[in-house]
From Swiss-Prot:
This is Small ribosomal subunit protein uS10m. Keywords: Mitochondrion, Ribonucleoprotein, Ribosomal protein, Transit peptide. GO terms for biological process: translation. One of its GO terms (cellular component) is ribonucleoprotein complex. It comes from the Eukaryota. SUPFAM superfamilies: Ribosomal protein S10. InterPro entries: Ribosomal_uS10, Ribosomal_uS10_dom, Ribosomal_uS10_dom_sf. Belongs to the universal ribosomal protein uS10 family. Disulfide bonds: none annotated. It is found in: Mitochondrion. Involved in mitochondrial genome encoded proteins translation. Involved in the binding of tRNA to the ribosomes. GO terms for molecular function: structural constituent of ribosome.
Amino acid sequence: MNMFRQAVRSFVRYQSTTSLNPKILPFNAKETPIPKCVEAVYHAPLKIEPTHRDLIADIQLRSYDNENLDFFSSFVLRAGYYLGIPMKGPKPLPTKRKRWTVIRAPFVMAKSKENFERHTHARLIRLYDCNTELVETLLSYISKHGISGVGIKCNLYQREPIDLDSKKDGPELENIDISSQLQGLDDVVGAKVVELLNNPEFKKHLQ
């Protein structure tokens, strides 16, 4: 392909104020073919389409620099693809803006103010149709190879049946030793507690 006749190696800008100067290294593509893993870097990350759309987790990435954020989002999508995790995203979340107003200096410059502003960019990646072990493997991998200035937050979703039998899990009232629980109480208070626990109207609410 003509687009791969020359290898363009772009260096990631870890500071948004630095200039980006890509280096072009000419070579003969027939003599030095580009491996498939390197060629895939020039394309968008591959994704596995979810079949059941069962949401397992979502990963939120936050950073003050959107360039590092987009770079790390692409890294997370590529790692999830090779682990076989169906993923959606990255979805841009609203940018949070925070401003401060402080004095320039004490004494002479006390009446002069200076404003500072901070932008927090965020991306959302959703994980579908996988188990928690794969999610933990992905989180440990991206945490180990994370870049500075990008925060990771993960929300896991677990589903439980709603028809649980509470009688099997909870202790029965007949097996509770009330006397051992009331040793440190007053006799009058203990008698009132025993009377309340033996009340049939009160037992209805505990079943």
